[in-house]
Amino acid sequence: VAQYRQHRRTGSLPAARDLHGRGRRRQYAGHVCAGGGGCSAGRQPAADQRQPDGYLNQFYEREKGRTTAFPASLPADAQPFDLLVINICSLAWADMDAVNLQNHPLWSKMDIMFDNFNSATAYSGPAAIRLLRASCGQLSHRDLYQPVNQQCYLFDNLAKLGFKEQLMLDHSGVFGNFLKELREQGDMQAPLMSQAGIGNELTSFDGEPIYNDLELLTRWLDQQQKGGDGRTATFFNVIPLHDGNRFVGSNKSADYPPRAQKLFDQLNTFLDQLEKSGRKVVVVIVPEHGAALVGDKMQMSGLRDIPSPNITHTPVGIKLVGMKAPHQGSPLQIKTPSSYLALSELVSRLVDGKVFSEPSVDWQALTQGCRRPRSSPKTTTPS
């Protein structure tokens, strides 16, 4: 059981690695944000759909040339702000639909929603690595565990511009060597924020506590307030929705709907706290992968061996708090097929912080290239 749970969390078995590195790429190829030039899927050369390996190799070759260009330095009038990336385990659009939470108020508070974001994997470790390496194009699963150019690391790019890196988890990070992978493959070297004194109502299947996310976020906000107006970039991984979690005192796996409801409520409450704090914060909510609450023709519900669309089609939202001219109305929807490089591109456009003090913001220009996809070939998707 323990080996299977580790497989589910990390994708550590050879068969799963092959699926990450090959099968899903056939669906995903051609839909990655083009680096350095915007967030839309670029025009792709024709490929023989009867030769999937050739198409796949062609895709990886294109991806090698895609990067986000961060500035070498910030202008003198740059405005400091906090970047908070909330990485949620086990949440896809299909899961929200299954438990009727797609219209939770949390999502209507977003300024930008990626409606067609692809997590590119069905496991936590690879998803976190891909997010931390968001400033370069996609790699095969195997290459995630190989050295990569330093410019690929999103948080390193921010650190070079004066952002202090911070790390939060609502778990220990020990199981499946998750924290170790963040350090070694994601180059996240910031010390883990203390969890001392934080309550927990959930435990993971192996009995480890899963700490209260609202309490952790409130502690984070308190620390930012005490730290003044410096620039920070925080990676926060949360796992209350992971399968096998239990309420304290129970030996039964907790139902998904109440856990999702509580997580969304807590994030919603935290955004209200941020608004009242007066801090300038860019909040990015980006799930690792889905929970597979709904099965498909490829596999039954609860299984994530095949990274099908029900698992990799995840809700990604961005909220800018503390703006002089905040976004009005419904979230700006980005329907273009996109992934992590699109997030890196948007962060690079926000990095000087001037958007917070401008009397008006051209949201269309801010997301230019993320809203109108150029033509790309049809790809093979599981049906």
Per-region residue spans from a language model:
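Pol beta-like nucleotidyltransferase catalytic core
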Residues: 267, 284-285
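Phosphate/adenylate-binding glycine loop and adjacent helical scaffold
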Residues: 351, 355-383
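Active-site-proximal alpha/beta segments of enzymes that process anionic O-linked groups
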Residues: 7-19, 23-29, 36, 46-232, ...
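Histidine-centered active-site microenvironments of extracellular/periplasmic hydrolases
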Residues: 280, 286-324
